[in-house]
Regions:
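Solvent-exposed, charged helical/coil patches
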Residues: 1-36, 98-99
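Histidine- and/or cysteine-centered catalytic micro-motif in compact active-site loops
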Residues: 9, 44, 76
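Generic secretory/membrane-interface signal
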Residues: 15, 54, 66, 98, ...
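Conserved catalytic cores of phosphodiester-cleaving nucleases, focusing on short active-site segments
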Residues: 16, 59-77, 91
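Active-site metal-binding core of divalent-cation-utilizing nuclease and nuclease-like domains
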Residues: 20-68, 109-117
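Nucleic-acid nuclease catalytic cores
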Residues: 73-117
Length: 117
């Protein structure tokens, strides 16, 4: 997953900060395609209660090969908080994927935040 960090650093350095989240997702997709990763964007994450689907959320990117991992992007003005970590934890549980990465292209201080768990 070190390669994902490298992609994030490249995007941060070359594209910069201040764009909406979907711009960074698209930039990451360019890197993933160029490296022949198997992935999908906007993956449906079902919310199940007592075997009934109540609704769904969407994970930004799910990588299936060469490893399984959920990438969740943010472009917010504040640092990542427990709220975002909880969101990614739910996605990991509901999609049965062990690895996840939170990526924040912080618009306030032009700093990249990268949390792998």
């Amino acid at each position: 997953m070190e390669k994902i960090k490298e992609f994030c650093d490249t995007i941060s350095n070359e594209l910069g900060h201040g764009y909406k989240e979907n711009i960074y997702v698209q930039a990451m997709c360019i890197h993933l395609r160029n490296e022949n990763y198997l992935f999908r964007t906007e993956v449906i994450v079902p919310i199940i209660y007592k075997e009934i689907q109540l609704g769904y959320e969407r994970a930004d990117i799910v990588i299936y090969h060469p490893f399984k991992c959920i990438l969740e992007f943010k472009a917010q003005n504040q640092a990542l908080s427990n709220k975002e970590k909880i969101q990614l934890s739910k996605y990991k549980k509901n999609l049965n994927i062990d690895n996840g990465i939170l990526i924040n292209f912080n618009n306030n201080n032009n700093k990249l935040e990268y949390i792998e768990f």
